[in-house]
Amino acid sequence: MKFSIVINGAPWSSPSALSALQFAETVLDSGHDIYRLFFYQDGVLNSSCLCVPPQDEEDIPARWQALIESNDIDAVVCAASALKRGILDKAEEDRYDKSGHNLRQ
């Protein structure tokens, strides 16, 4: 079975991002495939490479990145949601004349 999963929750403001991550891990552990992950609304905050959680908390964005890379999953970040929340790639940094970018690659 193939799954597409939408992630709407920020990494630490609610349990939804971690729940979605654990669901995705279970899907893969059960022998199923993930067609695409779509980070939307506050879920785009999981794509920032600048998040630094307290030492006693899990690094949820890093776990998403590891899952995506180790399983070669197509991961899409909603551009409008990302821009609204200050998540930019290099092209958007240049386009909007900002001083940096923070989208995980």
Regions found by a protein language model. Give the residues of each.
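Short internal beta-strands
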Residues: 35-41, 74-79
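Histidine-anchored nucleotide/phosphate-binding helix
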Residues: 17-30, 37
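Short, glycine-rich nucleotide/cofactor-binding loops
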Residues: 4-18, 47-52
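Helix C-cap/helix->beta junction micro-motif
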Residues: 30-33, 71
